[in-house]
């Protein structure tokens, strides 16, 4: 497992590092670009996300057809081009254009689908935890390095670093990552609309949207409020992010262990939302930088509790032959949330105040918490594995209640089922009849 998961996790972590490294300081430095204002800064933060939203599904679907490696390469090359455009930008509109190009390279769903291709569902949580650890490490490094490097070398160095890492990832993809496994599925692909409107997938998609929306709002507002309104030194922003990501990194470990490892994914999702509510409540009433920073720490804990389990949860509700497309939809919702968060956050901050923005976030989070209560607990799903040489009458399972899907890989015959509707002994009896 590690031979494929480690390099892919590095690629995903590097991509997130490239995305996150500009976020802590982008709103501050971009205000100095020609033609910039708070609304356009919000649009700048959201520009990357809107293109990711549009292209996640096409890239996920393309990867189901031509393969994950080729699709990853296309996305990384596009991201590199966008990074160079941003690095050379001298006005807000060129910077927005570069972020739009960066966003076209929508490989998040492809990389996650590729990791799930290499792993059994029962140990997928470990693979996702490894990926989550790389994302968390990339996140933590970017939060600390971003203010330091931008203060010393300027904003453009961050985009050059992003481009360089992406070039290295392409080399790694072809030198280290093993050949992709093939999957033969018994089902026809479900209509695309079902990937959007199936109840549990829809709840996970909306969860992805809200989580990314509140993250965009936080990264837009935190540096502006701390520096412009509460008098915190811009040069010391890295300390805020270092403290917050340290707590967040510990929370990520707990999230992965208790969520997928112990079967408490749904509970962890709910706890994360509760912490979002608490953090924005602290933001709303803060009159000092110290109290505001407490809210930042709480926010990072909630955010990092979610990170190791969200995509793993989404894959459990998707069939194996459409994981790329399903994760594309999931990530598209997330990136729409990032875009909308940047735009609505910039608008409210420009037209009203941060207090109004925080109250808006609290109200939406309460709705989100209630929605998650209706999510089916992912731990009710299990898989049975049989060797390819074992003779089984799998066709009879097509109309059996409780059978989610069955398919063949190059190693096993796999049957996924709902433990609340059917058990292993009954499945084996039916297959041997």
Regions found by a protein language model. Give the residues of each.
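Conserved MFS/SLC helix-loop-helix module at the cytosolic interface between two early adjacent transmembrane helices
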Residues: 54-90
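Helix-to-loop junctions at the C-terminal end of transmembrane segments
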Residues: 56-67, 251-264, 349
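Cytoplasmic helix-loop-helix junction between adjacent transmembrane helices
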Residues: 98-135
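Juxtamembrane intracellular "pre-TM" segments in multi-pass secondary transporters
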Residues: 178-207
């Amino acid at each position: 497992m590690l031979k494929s998961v480690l390099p892919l996790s590095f690629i995903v972590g590097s991509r997130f590092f490239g995305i996150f490294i500009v976020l802590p300081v982008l709103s501050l430095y971009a205000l100095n670009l020609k033609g910039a204002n708070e609304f356009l800064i919000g649009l700048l933060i959201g520009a990357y996300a809107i293109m990711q939203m549009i292209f996640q599904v096409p890239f996920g679907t393309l990867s189901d057809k031509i393969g994950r490696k080729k699709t990853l390469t296309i996305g990384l090359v596009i991201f590199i081009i966008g990074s160079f455009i941003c690095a050379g930008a001298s006005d807000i509109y060129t910077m927005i254009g570069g972020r739009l190009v960066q966003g076209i390279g929508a490989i998040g769903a492809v990389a996650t689908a590729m990791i799930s291709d290499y792993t059994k569902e029962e140990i997928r949580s470990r693979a996702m935890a490894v990926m989550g650890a790389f994302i968390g490490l990339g996140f933590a490094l970017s939060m600390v390095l971003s203010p330091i490097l931008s203060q010393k070398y300027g904003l453009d160095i961050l985009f050059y670093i992003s481009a360089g890492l992406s070039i290295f990832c392409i080399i790694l993809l072809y030198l280290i990552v093993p050949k992709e496994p093939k999957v033969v599925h018994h089902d026809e692909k479900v209509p695309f609309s079902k990937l959007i409107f199936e109840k549990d997938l829809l709840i996970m998609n909306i969860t992805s949207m809200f989580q990314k929306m509140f993250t965009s709002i936080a990264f837009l507002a935190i540096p502006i409020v701390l520096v412009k309104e509460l008098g915190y030194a811009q040069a010391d922003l890295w300390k805020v992010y270092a403290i917050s990501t340290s707590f967040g990194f510990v929370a990520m470990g707990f999230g992965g262990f208790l969520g997928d490892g112990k079967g408490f994914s749904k509970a962890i999702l709910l706890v994360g939302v509760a912490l979002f509510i608490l953090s924005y409540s602290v933001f709303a009433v803060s009159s000092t930088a110290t109290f505001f920073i407490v809210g930042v720490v709480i926010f990072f804990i909630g955010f990092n509790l979610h990170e190791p389990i969200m995509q793993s949860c989404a894959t459990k509700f998707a069939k194996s032959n459409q994981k790329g497309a399903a994760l594309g939809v999931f990530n598209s919702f997330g990136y729409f949330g990032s875009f909308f968060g940047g735009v609505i956050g910039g608008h409210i901050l420009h037209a009203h105040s941060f207090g109004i923005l925080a109250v808006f976030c609290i109200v939406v989070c309460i709705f989100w918490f209630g929605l998650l209560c209706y999510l089916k607990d992912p731990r009710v799903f299990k898989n049975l594995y049989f060797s390819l040489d074992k003779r089984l009458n799998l066709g009879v399972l097509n109309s059996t209640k409780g059978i989610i899907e069955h398919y063949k890989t190059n190693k096993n015959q796999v049957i996924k089922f709902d433990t609340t509707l059917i058990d292993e002994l009954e499945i084996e009896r039916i297959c041997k009849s």
